[in-house]
Amino acid sequence: METEFVNANHLPHFLRRALPALGPGLLIAIGYVDPGKWAATVEGGARFGFDLVLPMLIFNFVAILCQYLSARIGVVTGKDLAQICSDEYDKWTCMFLGVQAALSVIALDLTMILGIAHGLNLLFGMDLSTCVFLAAVDAVLFPVFATLLERCKASFLSTCIAGFLLLLYFFGVLISQPEIPLPMNGMPIKLSEDSAFALMSLLGASIMPHNFFLHSSMVLQHQGPPNISKGALCLNHFFAILCIFSGIYLVNYVLMNSAANVFYSTGLVLLTFPDAMSLMEPVFRSPVALCVFSLILFFANHITALTWNLGGQVVLQGFLRLDIPNWLQRATIRIIAVVPALYCVWTSGVEGIYQLLIFTQVMVALLLPSSVIPLFRIASSRQVMAAYKISAFLEFLALISFMGMLGIKIIFVVEMVFGDSDWAGNLRWSTSGGSSTSYTVLLITACSSFCLMLWLAATPLKSATHLDAQVWNWDVQNTVSEPSMQIEEEIFSETRYTEEESIGGQEQLSGPGKSAESYSDVTVANADPDLPVTIMESDQEHHLTTIKENHSEITFSSPGTFYEEETSPIIESVSLSAAMNVVPGSELLGAKKIDIESMDSVEKTVDIDGDFHAEKEDDEGDSWEPEESSKGVPGSTSSLTSDGPGSFRSLSGKSDEGGNGAGSLSRLAGLGRAARRQLASVLDEFWGQLYDFHGQTTQEAKTKKLDALGVDLKPSLLKVDTAGKEFSGYFSSVGGRASDSQIHSSLGDSPNHLRVPSNIDSSYGGQRGPSSLWSNHMQLMDAYAQGPSRSIADSSERRYSSVHTLPSSDGRCIQPATVHGYQIASIINQIAKERGSSSLNGQMDSPAPISPSLGPRNYRDPLTVAMGQKLQNGPSSSQPPGFQNLAVSRNSTLQSERHYHDVYSSGSADDAGKSANTKKYHSLPDIAGLAGPYRDLYMSEKNAQWDKSVGFGSSVSRTGYEQSYYSNTRSGAGAGGPLSFNRLPKGHGDAFSFHMTPDPGSLWSRQPFEQFGVADKSRVVGSGLGNRSNSINREVISPVDPEAQLLQSFRRCIVKLLKLEGSDWLFRQNDGADEDLIDRVAARERYLYEAETREMNCVANMGESPYLYSDRKSGSVLRNDDAAITNIMVSSVPNCGEGCVWRVDLIISFGVWCIHRILDLSLMESRPELWGKYTYVLNRLQGIIELAFSKPRSPMSPCFCLQIPASHQHRSSPPVSNGMLPPASKPGRGKCTTAATLLDLIKDVEIAISCRKGRSGTAAGDVAFPKGKENLASVLKRYKRRLSSKGIASK
């Protein structure tokens, strides 16, 4: 029956929080208004005085512990204890547990019947047998009573009635005593074999087995407010249980104290139930009091029955597999309970009823040891309770409680069979007299319960024996109790029109015939449903609304402000693939993950892709659904594909088939066997640079000075001295490019920042995303050029890293500082709008030079040549005539547009420039300059005032020194000799083009941008301006080279890990700050790889047909040259100044991440071969322990180097607070991983590994498994020893 509270909005705040915890506690406590429990308490006080007061207190504390654990299980797991037991144990075990719970309920109902019968006897003076019949017949009234309560909000009304009855009960017992005597000599414990029977009866009266299952079920029906965390709700339940059971103990103490004073001190013998009730004689003297007493018992009986009706049905269905109506359940229990009551009345009379009341409590106590094992095991199971697993202290208390129950039971059984105490003699005497029922029942109950206890003790939970099959992850705020839905989206198209709106605009996603769907099984938390979201795009400014999902959250955010001058309907095709698979909750591997990703803001295609990992079980093993993504480029008929590794299928649009693919049965934790082997090899290769197999620094690392992890290295310092306010020139050529890359943040670095308009030609060169990963120091950010060619609005602009001020109107059509290949579509669309498709095609075939002075008239189309260029890392295979050893660095980005003004002079120099120009494009590592002609041609037509300045120059204000620049280059260019820019000229030494010779004095022999984030210390970037007072002088302190090499090696290692099949699992764990930082670094590298792949494929697709065969061949090589992309990407290390995470501390965090991941894999690994590989890696990583855990470390905050567009955030990635700043860490994940955390994980790994066994009689089972376990156990012991000594320091 579904229950509910009254409207919570009308209740005070205290009641709204207290009722969900008080309700289940009160409904459970009403079962203690039971004559059987009174009889046990009074019997203990009458026979042993105050000796049993302290044991009764201990029993009460054990009851509080058991009920709290039961409630905690219900709150945390969202399932009741019976359901979990049915999942964790086999059918027969569950059946025996169900029988025990049913016996406990029948015993409670039996005592209730006897109590009601006694009340009717006292009230009306009828025969006791008749009263038992009448008490049994009241079960007929139960359906009416239950129906009435169902109509009147059963939970709330039942709770109120239970609370009222408990108050009456407590008040009646307390006022019946003229005074409450307290023993002044303490509460002595004098236990003996004679008190074993009384102890067992008190234990059964304090703890009832069926309440464990009932309480966890009632908790689910009394859900609290959604804004209360599980931890707070568990605490509320604890205090509610503590208060209620404290009141119960107070009543029992009063009864025992009174019995001790009345019977024990006077030597009277208590034989009948009326004698026990004589303790409350002051109350029973009034007929009204007797009537109230009978009504209390009557309603308590029905409330108990209703409680069982609400929660006990789960016990019958989960354990006994019985699905019967509620009224039939009630009638069955009542009939079974009436039979022994009538038998006792007919054979033994009033004395027999009293003995039967105590007998039922003893029988319940015999069931306790076997009943608490599932409760304690589940509450302490990490697989079931996850983070809410009980503490070690509570586990110890649970163990002591169990041992105490078992000890009392053993003493009782031994005394009952072999002892000579009075109660044992009476039982055996009744047997010899022919009445063997009670003795036989107790003996059978004890033996069967003991056997079940042994079976449960030897049978682990299923989740503990299948660590690699099931891990239950419940969210902190929401409980997942229904079957999980695995969603793979179906394809539909949506049409979206952009219009000019402010922040208050609303996002509208409309599809053909249907609106955007909302998934019913995804809980929207911490999101304002009224928050307006605007998705707008224009020709010049492209902003993409962030659509994020993180666990159970769906958050929509939009850019703060939009600036548009031209708006036109832009139809975007949004592909959403969806297919639904229902996976039962017992097979769920983890919480459902839905990734909603969007393409880059420059593209006009948004892909919303679902990324799901759900586990499916079959007869042979586990298989995983792969992640698929399909992304397209507008204007291209072919989809983006890549021939790279299959693990990047979500990046490049291709999913590999075969190997450890979707159909592989060798999947483990998201990684196939081959991927796990490659993971271990990659990590072993990386850490092998630093440490040997003993965790000691290698000699090679010392020689190369790579052992720098213990030194706090700082990035290089840059001092910027601005002596003048105006500049007639700026950094030119390569020097200018380098400075520009530091001043201008690339799209790859910050894709969604506001574009900055200016007339700086060099800033719009062909620099690509990864090449902008050099150090961007904050001091250089403010050294922003101001010249006559800049507008007033632009000159007042300041830059802070990748955050720019708003664009001015005159620079509206200028593209961002970094032009990626995948921006070509946006540029072409702009041209098409102004000129039409035919004009566009003509321009693409033969673009005319903008200015005759910028280059020869027969130069080759840069777009045509760039389409077929091949990415190179190192010397080019083909070199231009007259150039020797043409070495191109990825970081010294030589834009294609530079050839229009570098060395084109008259005469032989002009002729040499023609041939050299043609070959240059094939050896350039950068293709981004291909967009230059079209952009500037477009700008020249849109802005007439730029006719003389727009082109492929490299200065801020070319009008200031353009003439001297060209005269300088022309004068030094000879027909066959070395060009003048091979030397640093006095006037404009920085205005050199690219000429690479084997001359040791050549500028290009040093590869200046291979340094760590900044230029070589021998380079003075401002030297091209001479010694003028208004120049910028940079004092550069070269960083330690080993640090840069180490960080570059780290980047390569991350890229290799990302290429592993199923690598998403590695970077989707919710761990500490170190792991979170590495996950962010990986997300950044993943995004860069995605950008590179899209760019390469876009160029290859666009340039396939209209160009030369040699270009097509080069383009195909480029598309397949994945290794070249990787090497180019990691040829530098980003650095954004002070606070940047790219320092040696990042390597320490990576070491912690590696230890954590290897231990996670070892926890589920069952192959000795991979155990050995993990052992190698763990041996090397011993060197990290001292650095990571010897002293407390503060977590590094994410910097701008880790910024990625929110549209590319994966579901498990940390949420982005806004479009500019890096995402903040999640609450609770801001602490570094401690040694204690790893120690707990190591203990789990040891337990898991010890259970792995191979097939006996085989080489694997007899040799590989024992040897692998021995080696892995050895290194784990060393880790435990080292981490134990570092535990205090790391906390």
Swiss-Prot record:
Transmembrane spans: 18-38, 48-68, 96-116, 128-148, 155-175, 195-215, 231-251, 253-273, 288-308, 335-355, 356-376, 393-413, 441-461
Positions glycosylated per UniProt: 227, 550, 891, 1027
Keywords per UniProt: Cytoplasm, Endoplasmic reticulum, Glycoprotein, Membrane, Nucleus, Phosphoprotein, Transmembrane, Transmembrane helix
GO CC terms in record: endoplasmic reticulum membrane; nucleus; plasma membrane
Compositionally biased intervals (Polar residues): 635-653, 759-768
GO molecular function: cadmium ion transmembrane transporter activity; manganese ion transmembrane transporter activity
Phosphothreonine: residues carrying this PTM: 818
Biological processes annotated in GO: ethylene-activated signaling pathway; iron ion transmembrane transport; manganese ion transport
The keyword Cell wall biogenesis/degradation appears for this protein: no
InterPro entries: EIN2, NRAMP_fam
Domain-level remarks: The N-terminal (1-562) region seems to be regulated by upstream components of the ET signal transduction pathway, and may in turn regulate the C-terminal region. The C-terminal (454-1291) region regulates downstream events of ET and jasmonate signaling pathways, and can confer constitutive responses to ET. The nuclear localization signal (1276-1283) is required for interaction with ETR1.
Role, per record: Central factor in signaling pathways regulated by ethylene (ET) and involved in various processes including development, plant defense, senescence, nucleotide sugar flux, and tropisms.
Name the UniProt record assigns to this protein: Ethylene-insensitive protein 2.2
Species, as recorded: Populus trichocarpa (Western balsam poplar)
